[in-house]
Regions:
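Onset of an N-terminal alpha helix
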Residues: 1-9, 28, 48
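An amphipathic alpha-helix signature
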Residues: 5, 9, 32, 72-76, ...
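Generic N-terminal amphipathic, Lys/Arg-enriched alpha-helix
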Residues: 7-18
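Divalent metal-dependent phosphate-bond-processing catalytic cores, especially two-metal-ion Mg2+/Mn2+ enzymes
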Residues: 16-25, 29-42, 55, 104-215
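Alpha-helical phosphate/pyrophosphate-handling elements in metalloenzyme active cores
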Residues: 19-49, 61, 70, 74-82
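His-Asp-centered metal-binding catalytic motifs of divalent-metal-dependent phosphohydrolases/nucleases
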Residues: 45-63, 71, 92-102
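Hydrophobic, well-structured mid-protein blocks that either form specific transmembrane helices
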Residues: 82-119
Length: 215
C-alpha cells in the first residue's frame, strides 16, 4: 500500500505543480490529512480513501471546460499504470465523479462510506479560515467582484446554475460555504465544521460592517 501511496503523491505533486493555489498540492495535502483524521474513527477502505484524497482534483472540471469525466479518467489511467486492482480503481473513479458539492445538487446514484469520507475531507477545506482564503483566491483568479450589495445570493441553485455562476465571491458563502456544515457525514467532520462555520459567520459580520463603514 505504501508504495502505491508514494507513487501517487509524486504523480500528483508533478501534475499540480502550476495549479491554481486553491486547488494545488497544498489543498490535496490538507484533504489527505483530513481523510486520515476521519479514518481514525470511521471504518472504511483506507487505500480507497487515501487515493481519492490524493487524486480528487487531478483534473478538476472547473479548469477543463466543465468536463466532469476527465478527472476520473486521468486518475484511472494513472492507477492502472502502477498496477492497482481494477475494483479499487473503479471505486476511486466513482467517488471522484460524485463527491463534489456540484454533484450533490443533482441525483447521485452511487454511494459508499468512502464517498462520505471523501466529501467530508474536501468540504472541511472549503470552510473556516482556509476556506475564506480559497474563496477569494478563486474569485480573483476568475476576476470576480468581491461583493456587490445589488447582486443577492441565490438559494437552491441547480447544478447548472452553480456551474455557470459569475456572482461576487461573498455570494459564494451564502450559496455554498455556509451550507456545508449541515452536509457533513461523519461525527469527526461535523465537530470540526461547527467551529469553522462559526469563524466564517464572524468574518462575514466583520466584512459587512467594514463595507458599510460601521467599524
Amino acid at each position: 500500500m505504501q508504495q502505491i501511496i508514494d507513487l501517487t503523491v509524486a504523480f500528483v505533486q508533478d501534475r499540480l505543480k502550476f495549479a491554481e493555489s486553491g486547488h494545488d498540492w497544498w489543498h490535496i495535502q490538507r484533504v489527505w490529512n483530513n481523510t486520515k483524521l476521519i479514518l481514525e474513527t470511521e471504518k472504511a477502505d483506507q487505500l480507497v480513501c487515501e487515493l481519492t484524497a490524493l487524486l480528487h482534483d487531478i483534473a478538476d472540471s472547473k479548469f477543463h471546460d466543465g468536463d466532469e469525466t476527465i478527472g476520473p479518467r486521468v486518475a484511472g489511467e494513472f492507477l492502472a499504470s502502477i498496477g492497482v486492482n481494477q475494483k479499487i480503481i473503479e471505486h476511486v473513479q466513482q467517488i471522484i465523479l460524485n463527491m463534489s458539492f456540484k454533484a450533490s445538487l443533482g441525483e447521485i446514484a452511487f454511494h459508499s462510506k468512502e464517498l462520505e469520507i471523501a466529501q467530508d475531507a474536501d468540504r472541511l477545506d472549503a470552510i473556516g479560515a482556509i476556506g475564506i482564503a480559497r474563496a477569494f483566491n478563486y474569485g480573483g483568479y476568475k476576476n470576480r467582484e468581491m461583493y456587490d450589495p445589488n447582486v443577492k445570493p441565490k438559494t437552491n441553485l441547480s447544478k447548472e446554475e452553480y456551474k455557470n455562476t459569475t456572482a461576487p465571491t461573498i455570494n459564494h458563502f451564502h450559496e455554498k460555504l455556509l451550507l456545508l456544515k449541515d452536509k457533513m457525514n461523519t461525527p469527526t467532520a461535523k465537530a470540526i465544521a461547527e467551529q469553522r462555520h462559526h469563524y466564517m459567520e464572524g468574518f462575514l459580520q466583520q466584512f459587512y460592517a467594514e463595507w458599510e463603514g460601521k467599524q
